[in-house]
Design a protein with these regions (language model features):
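Positively charged n-region of N-terminal signal peptides that target proteins for export
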Residues: 1-7
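Bacterial N-terminal signal peptides
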Residues: 7-15
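Sec/Tat signal peptide C-region and signal peptidase I cleavage site
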Residues: 17-21
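Extended amphipathic ligand-handling, pore-lining, and cofactor/metal-binding catalytic surfaces
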Residues: 22-291
């Protein structure tokens, strides 16, 4: 009995150093008392159906990919947060969730936003992070369309997904939101890459940026297009997809004599796009925190 008890105590002593330094999939060894979390940041949506297929889906993929991290979410749109609050649904902002994580004792945080561009929203998120105190390390992942490699991967995924809609006079148009920052040039880059990489019947246009609906109509006319499929170039196929793309844009192109169908699928619904966000989490870089 004494021998068995001695063996048990000996084994426990051997295990103690391992408890002091637990290996984490992103941060490496974590010391006793250190805890790691992943914060997924979304613009948000008031539509339950598309939320389940996009935001909830990518959150689930993150939990599956990083089982040793506590996964939380935050939303950035004040308007959507207010709408949901009236329904009795509470969504917190990045600042609120980060403060809560700090109170709960989390020391290492990685943040991944489901944004497309390196623009105003990413800059706003960095300002929120810069105000945080008490964390030992914070990492921020890149948006979906950060590099040329990212853009090429996305165009290939989309072209493959909609190959059924492409033909000699059949075209696919991916409609993005657009931006008032220099990041809006990314849409023109995507448009160019479709053609450069062998998908000349795939195009990109934007609701509030460039290329515009007017430039799109001129291009389709010059190409003698007959049929067009409109697809949201948006993480969530919400109000813009339903009102602008399937409404105003569809009507405008039909007035040009085109046969138009809409595939209202958000980027967040596509497994390969979800995989790209997961890869950006893995490659997230440390963000300098001031004391």
């Amino acid at each position: 009995m004494k021998k068995a008890l001695f063996s048990l105590i000996f084994c426990m002593l051997l295990a103690m150093p391992a408890a002091r330094a637990r290996e984490n999939s992103l941060f490496g060894p974590l010391q006793r008392g250190e805890r790691a979390a992943l914060l997924m940041v979304h613009f948000g949506t008031s539509h339950d159906d598309t939320r389940e297929r996009t935001i909830d889906a990518v959150n689930a993929r993150a939990r599956e990919a990083f089982p040793d991290l506590e996964v939380r979410e935050a939303w950035t749109s004040p308007t959507i947060i207010r709408i949901l609050k009236k329904r009795g649904i509470v969504r917190q902002t990045p600042d609120e969730v980060l403060q809560q994580l700090r109170k709960e004792g989390y020391t290492h945080i990685v943040i991944q936003a489901t944004l497309l561009l390196e623009g105003a929203e990413t800059e706003s998120l960095r300002h929120v992070v810069a105000r945080q105190k008490g964390f030992k390390e914070v990492r921020i992942g890149k948006p979906l369309l950060y590099s040329v490699k990212d853009c090429r991967q996305v165009t290939e995924i989309l072209a493959t997904r909609h190959v059924d809609a492409v033909g000699r006079r059949n075209h696919v148009v991916f409609v993005g939101h657009g931006s008032y920052t220099p990041a809006t040039a990314t849409y023109s880059q995507l448009d160019h890459l479709f053609t450069a990489d062998g998908h000349p019947n795939c195009h990109v246009a934007t609701i509030e940026g460039y290329p515009t609906l007017l430039t799109l109509k001129e291009r389709l006319k010059s190409l003698k297009a007959r049929r067009v499929r409109l697809v949201p170039l948006l993480f969530v196929a919400g109000d813009h997809a339903r009102n602008d793309i399937a409404g105003e844009w569809k009507e405008a192109l039909e007035k040009e004599g085109l046969q138009v169908d809409c595939r209202l699928e958000g980027l967040g619904e596509i497994p390969e796009i979800q995989d790209l966000y997961i890869s950006h989490i893995r490659s997230a870089e440390p963000w300098h925190l001031t004391d």
